[in-house]
Amino acid sequence: IDPDNIMFIKFDSEVQLLRRFVEIWVSDYPDVVTGWNVEYFDIQYIVTRIIRLLGEDVAKQLSPWKHIKQKSTEIFNKVQSTWRISGMTIVDYMDAFKKFGYKYGPQESYKLDHIGYSVLGKKKLDYSDYGGLTELYEQNPQLYLDYNLRDTQLIEELEDETSLLQLVMTVAYGGGVDYKDAFGTVGIWESTIYRRLIADKIVPPIKGGPGANLGALVGGYVKDPEQGMHPWVVSFDLNSLYPHL
């Protein structure tokens, strides 16, 4: 991170800090927000604190459309909540690494500390001598600042090394879908097929439109097996080629 882009501002209260945070945010709305586990930790915490201390109307200012909505998702049998901020996309860099960082192989942990060391040879700053972040803040404020800066620097260096955020955007633009839909496959295929049909002057049925409740699809054709050896038989596993296919 360019030192000229680092600014330290001291506040007398959390209320002042959050007000200034909102002012900086709305002065130049981001199109994409990213970070490690940012969706279910940072966004959830920041928006919830703004609502609690400043009110929901102030929290709505985070959205260029002045609309936020809480959503919950079950992850590994545990319900996790976050906030959806209309008008911008939250691309969690941890999810991007899990989805597209396959060249680095399966990881024993997906904590930023481990991934940073696995990919870059760099870890988060250690503050174990202080017990917790509150003690670190009170006893060594400079290390506290450096600790937070290091997290941001690791994300930036991971992107320089892997270009995962760039890949997410490339898949989204190529598939004609939102950035979040680049993590799936159905939306990309639907968009690709839809645009091909339109180019061939064929109007496909609209999801939820007339005829949407015609019942379940019959499904694909499955040929009865013919036992024995057969020449010129080849099987292609296309699943492993996503999103390159």
Regions found by a protein language model. Name each.
Residues 13-21:
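Well-ordered alpha-helical segments embedded in enzymatic catalytic cores
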Residues 131-245:
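Common nucleic-acid-contacting/processivity interface regions adjacent to the catalytic cores
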Residues 42-52, 239-245:
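Short active-site loop/helix that positions an aromatic residue
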Residues 21-45:
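Proline-aspartate-enriched helix->loop->beta-strand connector
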Residues 3-8, 12, 43, 52, ...:
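Active-site-proximal helix-loop-helix substrate-binding element of RNase H-like nuclease domains
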